[in-house]
Amino acid sequence: MTKQRVRIFVKGKVQGVFFRQALKVKAIQHGILGWVKNLNDGRVEAVLEGDIEKVNILVEWCHAGSANSRVEDVEIRNEKFTNEFSNFDVLY
């Protein structure tokens, strides 16, 4: 399968609404590796690596967000696949 790596920035009401935790659950369900963290400007940043179809599922989920979030914008940057991760972490 084709592998993909993306870095995403999610803007909106995405902090304090369990967005990172929900993304981690989805990532684990789909076998995606990487990390997610809050940024000081109120956005959430994540790096996702895995099968292209599964990464795309998570990117689409980020447009909808967790139950209490309100996503305004999702910026997606394609990056070179590195296979550097062994799990999916919430960074603090």
Region locations from a protein language model:
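Intrinsically disordered, low-complexity, mixed-charge
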Residues: 1-92
